[in-house]
Amino acid sequence: TDTALMADLHLKIQPGTDVMLFNAMLHVMMQNGWLDMAYINKYTEGFDAVAKGLVDYTPKRAASVCGVPEGDIVTAATWFAQSNRTLSLYCQGLNQATTGTDKNTALIALHLATGQIGKEGSGPFSLTGQPNAMGGREVGGLSTLLPAHRELNNPAHVAEVAAFWGVKQISATPGASAVEMFDQLEQGKIKAVWVACTNPAHSLPNSQKVARALQNAELVVVQDAYLTPATVQYADVLLPATTWGEKEGTVTNSERRISRVWPAMPAYADSKNDWQIVVEFAKRLEVELQKLGVESPRLGNTSNAFMPY
């Protein structure tokens, strides 16, 4: 890659061996006394178990598994631990993998163990893979996370979000992942799916299973700016969305700065911003729910819940 060509040290590891590399680096740091024990004792839990598990992760073993020289692993560990500021930039190679959680955890452990986190110029910095992916997380775009980085497994956070939404309670049970969702769609456990800003018939693993799931669904709604995505052919309802140059709202960029975005041109024909489509649907749903005696939530101001806004 262009970045690798400019690197002072390129660790050209075998695919899928990231965790071995990171653990070996932490092993080197531990053996040389380069850990920030004051930070570890004050801000982390479970370090003794981690240290015990690192005994066999020698740089020699990692070199044979990862396919890189042992000396390069030691060099990487040295630079990481002894630099005044260490910043890790990573993207889909760590995030979108069958062991993605393990990869992220191992890298973050390097920062926690050396205190290279929570200060200017340091920290694990996930770039994510799509524009405004971070913005989606901030407003609750994940099935396992509440808005404004509130955790589902924290009762205080759940109560806080419920109060903000103006409802008595919300489910603290994490939702399904994208793969799990389509498994349940195929099995009939999920009856309907609303696809927005993605193309699962093309991008999800096991495309044949995804196709069967979409065919089995009682209702498929696709919200997209184009007619060409593979998922469109399964749509019962197609909602025309605007492209990036026609949208207004906010975007959270790679440095986590939130920017106000204005459209460069008017929306084409009857297309609407994604958020406008959701709001219009919610208004219509509210009318139907009121007929059933369901009380409508009263939302608070976003900036009151999430200070960056």
Regions found by a protein language model. Give the residues of each.
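Surface-exposed loop and adjacent secondary-structure segments within mature catalytic domains
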Residues: 132, 139-148
